[in-house]
Amino acid sequence: MKTVLIVLLRFYRYAISPMLGRNCRFHPSCSEYAIEAVQRHGAVRGAWLAARRVARCHPFHPGGYDPVP
């Protein structure tokens, strides 16, 4: 499951994200964060952390440096 999520995230990062432009307010970007979270914490907790991060990535949030816990 972990490998499948990482492959899907990398596909998004290299195939879809360049067409959308740099929109993430955080460093590392949301896709980089998601890959690292899944690698470090496993599929379930990593996906939960990534979903929480994407929910915070909007124009009204200041963004900034936000590493994977």
UniProtKB/Swiss-Prot annotation:
Keywords: Cell inner membrane, Cell membrane, Membrane. InterPro entries: Membr_insert_effic_factor_YidD. It holds the Pfam family YidD. One of its GO terms (cellular component) is plasma membrane. It is a peripheral membrane protein. Signal peptide: none annotated. It is found in: Cell inner membrane. NCBIfam families: membrane protein insertion efficiency factor YidD. Could be involved in insertion of integral membrane proteins into the membrane. PANTHER family: MEMBRANE PROTEIN INSERTION EFFICIENCY FACTOR-RELATED. Belongs to the UPF0161 family. This is Putative membrane protein insertion efficiency factor.
